[in-house]
Amino acid sequence: MVQALNCIVAVAQNMGIGKQGNLPWPRLMNDFKHFQRMTTTSSVPDKQNLVIMGKKTWFSIPEKNRPLKGRINVVLSKELKELPHRAHFLAKSLDDALKLTEQPELANKVDMVWIIGGSSVYKEAMSYPCDLKLFVTRIMQDFECDTFFPEFDLEKYKLLIEYPSVLSNVQEEKSIKYKFEVYEKNH
């Protein structure tokens, strides 16, 4: 059984995370590098992190970048019958995806589990009975969005003042200010 989950997301002030299958803001290189570093870096030699994403998130990744390198890619879908091209695993639910980590072929290969979207996958992960960290890139302005991050209770989530390898100062790229935040919920 998975002891902890990590969610990583970039959100606008209005809690928007997407528009028509894309990010609603221009690509922010330092945020992209932060996402890569956090989801790829394993704390255990010879293990990889596992990234879980919904079908729409998988197909929003440019084909040349699928699967996300250096990570075990799991796509969640109740509709898909076949594994999407180049994905490593297909699961019907978050529970099924997490059970994969107990299978012999993955049991000794997976370090951390990262939820990378979309909205319904985040919502399911946030109600999962385990410790959870939310790695939030807080975009400090509104953007027009059609997909939103689920509301979360700040009474249950503690904002960590510092976290290893996460910058705490405000960043700015392409006239967009943002900051990295880490929240923790203990089960």
UniProtKB/Swiss-Prot annotation:
Gene3D superfamilies: Dihydrofolate Reductase, subunit A
Statement: the UniProt record of this protein carries the keyword Lipid biosynthesis: no
Binding locations of substrate: D31, F32, K33, H34, F35, Q36, R71
Positions that bind NADP(+): 10, 16-22, 55-57, 77-79, 117-124
Listed pathway(s): Cofactor biosynthesis; tetrahydrofolate biosynthesis; 5,6,7,8-tetrahydrofolate from 7,8-dihydrofolate: step 1/1
GO MF annotation: an example: dihydrofolate reductase activity
A Pfam family annotated for this UniProt entry: DHFR_1
Catalytically driven reaction(s): (6S)-5,6,7,8-tetrahydrofolate + NADP(+) = 7,8-dihydrofolate + NADPH + H(+)
EC number: 1.5.1.3
GO biological process entries: dihydrofolate metabolic process; folic acid metabolic process; one-carbon metabolic process; tetrahydrofolate biosynthetic process
Keywords: NADP, One-carbon metabolism, Oxidoreductase
Keyword Methyltransferase found: no
Domain DHFR: 4-185
Protein task: Key enzyme in folate metabolism. Catalyzes an essential reaction for de novo glycine and purine synthesis, and for DNA precursor synthesis.
Similarity-based family: Belongs to the dihydrofolate reductase family.
Name of the protein: Viral dihydrofolate reductase
